Amino acid sequence: GKISQDGQGQFGFESANDSLLSGINGRKSIEVSTDGQAIPGTVTDDVPATNGANVTLTLDLDLQTYVQQQLEQAKANSGAKSASAVVLDAKTAQVMAMATSDSIDPMGDIKKQLEQGKEFGNSTISAPFEPGSVAKIITAAGAIENGVTSPDEVHTVPGSIDMAGGNVKDAWDHGPAQYTTTGIFGKSSNVGTLMLAEKLGEDKFDQLLTGFGVGRATGIELPSESEGLLPQRAQWSGGTFANLPIGQGMSVTLLQMAGIYQAIANGGADCAADYFRGAGWSWCGGGPAGAGAHPGGE
């Protein structure tokens, strides 16, 4: 972020938390003589200034630098238009690194960066996308947590499956194949994933998505966070359940997706993502404060 010449937050963290960081001006009224000297005992209004809060960001500078460098290299190697990355501490959900290739560096030439197409926004929280197969982890977690399968259970997975009048196939042609639950997700099988989702049922799967925070902002201390998109259960059409378990028909931000994996890595405890310590910050650590039990938690 950046502050203006008068010390007000202009964008980024400094803008979102301007009232926290700025403090409150003080004031004092006192009579003075004709030559400008203060007259003792004439103070009528004396309110001391209040300092702004001391805040320490959770970012690891070395890791942030490394991630930014790797991000730029990956973008160049792949020919992508943009790239972004988020690294969370699995136990606390503290943001250890958050990098984008298209955000303005507040310490650089702002005008030049704008001409290059860079933006003031932070795409890791403001640019939702359809996650696709990376969101199949939600189906996997829900199926195992609810006892409809186990990691080593063997399934006969056909090459396609009929869902609400439509036919969904895997990315590769195959006849009936034997896959364990682990193998279904290792191969990223659409068909196998939908088979397990059907065992969960639509209502349970909707609760699962909601519990993992899909369609809900994380509440991170940064401006312009998007909620993403999750169709309301009452608005589901016939094909909705053929899409959601394989990461289609919904959108998430990169931070939301990272948070889903954080919850799983933390044994099912979802800690709200934190960007700074201090000013009331508390460690979640997978405990009950600020944590929700997943799948299907609050």
Which role fits each region the language model picked out?
Residues 1, 59, 89:
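Flexible glycine-/small-residue-rich
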